[in-house]
Amino acid sequence: MKIQEVKRILTRWQPSSFTLYREVFTQYGGSINMHPDIVDYFMKRHNWHFKFFHYKEDDKIKGAYFICNDQNIGILTRRTFPLSSDEILIPMAPDLRCFLPDRTNRLSALHQPQIRNAIWKLTRKKQNCLVKEAFSSKFEKTRRNEYQRFLKKGGSVKSVADCSSDELTHIFIELFRSRFGNTSSCYPADNLANFFSQLHHLLFGHILYIEGIPCAFDIVLKSESQMNVYFDVSNGAIKNECRPLSPGSILMWLNINRARHYCQERQKKLLFSIGILKPEWEYKRMWSTPYFTGKSIC
């Protein structure tokens, strides 16, 4: 018996199945890189290998997770597919207190009361940004004024749900090139198109246009459960010539507001991640609170 198998036995995590994992996720939710539809996509379309585990307490399954390709908890492929790897939120019951037998240094701060063998501040540097529960009236007024100015300059808004997968792929690649030029590589076009096509139902948010031409698009993915809805901005791109109109700020505000309304209508908790905090991304502090990600010690 391997050491890792012994660790799982000692910490009460049992071998499980994809079917059971989906059920647990549907109940408790998790980050988009743990979503069963994403898992299913990589199992069927890319022949990736997954091992599933669940935690049972008082004859009730309280949590589940998987190991991808015998390496990681979560699907970590941010350079080739539009999936964030900034944090991992494992589907767990709110009252679960357990030891996690596998290593990761990307645990969501929301797991701090749940996972006993993790550190959250000592030697930790990486912080993930979760959108604030509310903004000040001054902040909201500034965003509304930006939006009205944008509309008066010929701006318009379209839902990603109304765009085809090919259209979304073309828009994102063009805007990405405009934003980064040759300084950063975009996702392979075939990967992006196939991902959008197969997982279109997980896409959320808007695209901004100026005089009918796309000027801003954030890839926002939605992970919904019975308890909460987790939104994740995996990447974004804007048209450089439109920067004076603040399209990035307007788009963020519109997407967050739409996410809030979506959750309010369904009476579910909102979780909205805008990724890691870096010195060049200090603007994220306007929108969010940074939290250290946790590292499991095992």
Please place each PLM-identified region on the residue numbering.
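Well-ordered, non-membrane alpha-helical segments in soluble/globular domains
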Residues: 84-86, 92-93, 103-104, 139-143, ...
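Short catalytic/ligand-binding loop motif for oxyanion handling, primarily in non-cytosolic enzymes
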Residues: 62-63, 72-76, 281-283
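A conserved beta-strand-loop-helix scaffold within acyl/acetyltransferase catalytic domains
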Residues: 2-59, 66-72, 116-120, 133-243
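Non-catalytic accessory segments adjacent to catalytic cores
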Residues: 83-125
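Short, solvent-exposed cationic patches
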Residues: 76-100, 235-247
